[in-house]
């Protein structure tokens, strides 16, 4: 089985590649990552220790994935996930998040490849989320039945980042219908763990821990600066 992990030197991609390599013996894993994000070159070294090759190419370009040849499964982990960055560098975020999906799908239809696409909870409407009732007392366990699920509204404004991921989801569905491709979409929430290079705009919990270890100040913006918001962490 030949697996290509797009964004394989990122936080999720590298951990997935290493996990799969250790768990499945008869498997060929390729990482495709242009190493544009800080810390990705460190993850490339981790992959190399397990003989996982990284192809340093821009996935949004037409020929990058075609040159790799037949792939049985694409795991698409690549994206530009920062909300603030999507406001400042809109064209770049669209290229990194949407065009990469398009190139993957054009190759998948050629070889009838399966697809796992990591999307985001940011596809949901910010306006409708802000209308939800809020409370500050979480001394008792909150009601898990009041969670936001995949049926929540996605038709209103969310963010440029969320829009690129939602467009990618819809394009995958269209390709699946037209070319009978099998796919799975996971709308990830807050993800944290080893080898996450936390920054203020992405990797919140790693960033938070780093700040505490270094005894640096943290600025909370939720609930008027008190930081009382509750999030799920995977």
Name every feature range the model reports, one short phrase each.
Residues 1-189:
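N-terminal Rossmann-like NAD(P)+-binding domain of SDR-like oxidoreductases, especially those catalyzing
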Residues 37, 197-204:
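Short acidic-hydrophobic sequence patches enriched in Asp/Glu that either
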Residues 202, 233-234:
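Alpha-helix initiation and capping sites
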Residues 97, 101, 201-206:
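Amphipathic alpha-helical segments in well-structured domains
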Residues 86, 148-159, 183-197, 208-233:
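A conserved pocket-lining segment of Rossmann-fold NAD(P)-dependent short-chain dehydrogenase/reductase
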Residues 118, 203, 229:
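A conserved catalytic-core signature of glycosyltransferases
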């Amino acid at each position: 089985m030949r697996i290509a992990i797009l964004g394989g030197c990122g936080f999720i991609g590298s951990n997935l590649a290493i996990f799969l390599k250790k768990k499945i013996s008869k498997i060929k894993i390729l990482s495709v990552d242009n190493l544009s994000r800080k810390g990705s070159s460190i993850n490339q070294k981790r992959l190399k220790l397990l003989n996982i090759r990284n192809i340093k190419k821009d996935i949004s370009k037409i020929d990058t994935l075609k040159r790799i040849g037949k792939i049985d499964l694409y795991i698409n982990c690549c994206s530009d996930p920062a909300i603030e960055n999507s406001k400042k560098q809109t064209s770049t975020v669209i290229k990194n998040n949407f065009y990469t999906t398009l190139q993957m799908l054009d190759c998948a239809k050629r070889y009838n490849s399966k697809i796992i696409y990591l999307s985001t909870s940011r596809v949901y409407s910010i306006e409708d989320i802000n209308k939800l009732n809020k409370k500050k007392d979480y001394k008792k366990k909150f009601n898990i039945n009041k969670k936001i699920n995949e049926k929540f509204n996605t038709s209103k404004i969310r963010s440029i980042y969320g829009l690129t991921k939602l467009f990618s989801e819809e394009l995958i569905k269209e390709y699946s219908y037209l070319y009978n491709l099998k796919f799975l979409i996971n709308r990830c929430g807050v993800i944290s763990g080893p080898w996450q290079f936390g920054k203020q705009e992405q990797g919140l919990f790693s960033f938070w821990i780093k700040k505490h270890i270094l005894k640096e100040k943290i600025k909370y913006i939720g609930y008027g600066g008190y930081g009382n918001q509750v999030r799920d962490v995977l």
